């Protein structure tokens, strides 16, 4: 970890030293939109989100350097509406991801950013889960951000194999951030 820049080094050949300087990946442009007043109580939320996305982007095999994503910080009412409209589930949830559909065969300008998609995170559900699971708020926010980001780049947990792969990657990214395994039994995390 480069303490000065607080960014992870690139993986593989890109992480090699060049004239004594570590080469860093181009990171996705991340816009954080606060749409629910309850998030104003968490002054550091945007910095936590940016750090989580940057760390995840530096540890995955997908090139996200020319990409953009948006993260909407909403409340339970807002995410409940999204969940009902898009998934047919009329209740709040902690995080939703909406991967952008990339048109196949459609040319785009070389300098046009690639849209990864959108993530929505619900404040009350996140806060409640963190409290119930005895996790610091910032750790749980980092985890949900990483989870949503991985969905945008194609990871899923529909099967046990997919879930295992996604959870293992989440653990590695969180460990890089100094955050304990969120899937460990609670008594081990206390």
UniProtKB/Swiss-Prot annotation:
Family matches, as InterPro entries: MetalPrtase_cat_dom_sf_prd (IPR023091), YbeY (IPR002036), YbeY_CS (IPR020549)
Highest taxon above the source species: Bacteria
Keywords linked to the UniProt accession: Cytoplasm, Endonuclease, Hydrolase, Metal-binding, Nuclease, Ribosome biogenesis, rRNA processing, Zinc
Cofactor requirements of the protein: Zn(2+)
Compartments (UniProt record): Cytoplasm
TM helices/strands, residue ranges: none
GO cellular component terms listed in the entry, alphabetical order: cytoplasm
Pfam families, alphabetized: YbeY
The record's free-text note on cofactor binding: Binds 1 zinc ion.
Annotated disulfide bonds: none
NCBIfam families hit by this protein: rRNA maturation RNase YbeY
Family per record: Belongs to the endoribonuclease YbeY family.
PANTHER family recorded: ENDORIBONUCLEASE YBEY, CHLOROPLASTIC
Protein name per UniProt: Endoribonuclease YbeY
Natural source organism: Nitrobacter hamburgensis (strain DSM 10229 / NCIMB 13809 / X14)
Gene expressing this chain: ybeY
């Amino acid at each position: 970890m480069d303490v000065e820049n607080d960014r992870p080094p690139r993986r593989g050949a890109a992480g090699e030293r060049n004239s004594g300087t570590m080469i860093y990946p181009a990171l996705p442009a991340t816009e954080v939109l606060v749409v629910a007043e309850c998030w104003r109580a968490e002054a550091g939320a945007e910095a936590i989100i940016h750090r989580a996305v940057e760390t995840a982007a530096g540890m995955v095999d997908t090139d996200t350097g020319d990409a953009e994503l948006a993260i909407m910080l909403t409340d339970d009412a807002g995410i409940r509406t999204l969940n009902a409209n898009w998934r047919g589930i009329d209740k709040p949830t902690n995080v939703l991801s909406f991967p952008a559909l990339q048109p196949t065969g459609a040319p785009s300008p070389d300098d046009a950013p690639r849209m990864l998609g959108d993530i929505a995170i619900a404040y009350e559900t996140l806060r409640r889960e963190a409290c119930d699971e005895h996790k610091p708020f910032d750790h749980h926010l980092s985890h949900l951000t990483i989870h949503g980001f991985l969905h945008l780049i194609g990871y899923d947990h529909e099967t046990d194999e997919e879930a295992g792969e996604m959870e293992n990657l989440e653990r590695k990214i969180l460990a890089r951030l100094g955050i304990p395994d969120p899937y460990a039994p609670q008594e081990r995390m206390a």
